[in-house]
Amino acid sequence: MNPNDRDLVRVRRYFNLDSIAGAGDEISKIKNLLAWVHNTIRHDGSSYNPEEKNAIALYEICKKEDRGVNCRMMAQMLNECYLAMGFKSRYVTCLPKSYINDCHVINVVYSNTLDKWLWVDPTWNAYVMDDKGNLLSISEVRDRLKKGEFVTVNEDANWNHKTPCT
């Protein structure tokens, strides 16, 4: 999607995303936008999905009703922020190995610098790395887990600023 799309321009201006992303390199912008969504909207997996599911509407209903949204809505919001800033981005539904009637939704964002899609999770403010601190894609995480190789998440990964995940 083109970042000059009028809806994405509106998102970029409404949230002042240029300021949030910062003036650093591409990776720092990706991390800054991830942290901002995580810090702005709290996760509440039991909340109902609002009728309007765009980033601005999600933000406004959460502020108005002092509520959170589920992981899918958080990923939707982050996806729109990335797209508005010119990053290629998608949200991805992750299913457990055994069916348990639940899922988790994360994002992948394309890094031109690293020439790959990166795993990012706004619910946990998390990104996944190898033992050298290199950011990983979903397929790299999967391959490393299958081989029993080291993976970790960033030290500040957490759920709603209450539960660290490291």
Residue map of PLM features:
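Loop/turn elements at helix/coil->beta-strand transitions in domains of secreted/extracellular proteins
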Residues: 26-31, 83-90, 112-117
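Secondary-structure boundary elements
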Residues: 1-69
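Sec-exported extracytoplasmic/periplasmic mature domains
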Residues: 16, 35-42, 83-87, 111-112, ...
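His-Asp-centered catalytic microenvironments across diverse enzyme cores
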Residues: 99-101, 109-166
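Active-site neighborhood of thiol-dependent amide/isopeptide-bond enzymes
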Residues: 43-106
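Broad hydrophobic/π-residue packing in well-ordered secondary structure
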Residues: 34-36, 43, 74, 106, ...
